[in-house]
Amino acid sequence: MPTNDGVTARTMKTGGVTTRVHFSGPEDGTPVMFNQGTLTTATWWEETLAALPVEFRGISPDRRGFGGADPAVKVDATRGMGDYVDDLVALLDELDIDKTPIVGMSLGGNIAWHLMADHSERLLSVNLSGPGSPYGFCGTKDVEGTPIHDDFAGSGAGLSNPLLIEQLKAKNAGIDSPFTVRSALRLLVWKPPVIPEREDAFVAASLEMQVGEDSYPGDVVESPNWPHFKPGRWGSINALSPKHIRDPKAILDAPNKPPVLWVRGDADVAVADGAASDPATLGAMGLKPGWPGPEEHPAQPMVGQTRYILDLYAEAGGTYEEVVVADCGHVPSMTKPDEFNRVFHAHLKSTTQAGGQQ
């Protein structure tokens, strides 16, 4: 897939995966590493990469399972974000980067939480755009991430709509069904009526993903507990289950505590206290039969969980800033780029000056 102006791409082999990596800026610039979300590739960062201040070198790889990554290399969901983190650290080593700011969108935010816990010494700052909850996606009931069921029912690959999976397999880029990727992005990600100028490129990038029981969304495992599925072994959505995700409180004991910028849209329905795809949200709307009610199966307080962990992080010696972008959906970096870049660039400059370059 061709890149946007100001961005180049090349194929690289690092660690256990061969993948496509996007670059922007001067080769001797301060490196900034980007990670994108579910249903996306590095293409989604191209405008942000190209808009970086001239002293920075933007880097964004396609994650395993997506885009230009080797389709033979799968995600072991039982490691949570572990495979993605290992791939990213291997890329840093290959590029001879000691420390870098990390930028995470959606699932890329979950990768950032894991990096903060296990590789804090590699991070100059953490910059989040609509990040996933540090407790993963669905299956928990309070800000402390308490699982609703012992088997973590309500999280994992069963969250993905089978009709969306069918359209992904068919590579349908249209809007003839409410379950095509374009329809899903318009409803859940962009925030109606917003349609990005390069929507065609973003949809094409999403359709590059590998779909199946060992890829996206992964294997679905039955559970006796409503909504009658639990996390499986493979793929990105199972990897997001709180069963597999790294304990977020591990960041409290990390030897380095990089400053965190958390930017979110005020109208985000993909990551929210009661996200649109949360089984409890769908149950309350009458769209998922058998919902036992909010006492037995409440919606996950994703934003509340993020703030809870970051407040603990601040008490443990870290710092964070929360910025809420008005009239904005799930990806402020894409749909409100001026607002996002203003705070993002300021954070980059202040934290790289304080922490030194690579």
Give the location of each predicted region:
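Catalytic active-site module of serine/aspartate enzymes centered on a nucleophile-bearing elbow/loop
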Residues: 277-358
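Short glycine-enriched nucleophile-adjacent loop
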Residues: 109-120, 126
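Glycine-rich phosphate-binding loop signature in dinucleotide/nucleotide-binding domains
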Residues: 26-27, 95-98, 255, 347, ...
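Active-site loop/oxyanion-hole signature of alpha/beta-hydrolase fold enzymes
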Residues: 14-15, 60-107, 117-118, 133, ...
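Conserved HGGG/HGGXW glycine-rich cap/lid loop of the alpha/beta-hydrolase fold
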Residues: 17-77
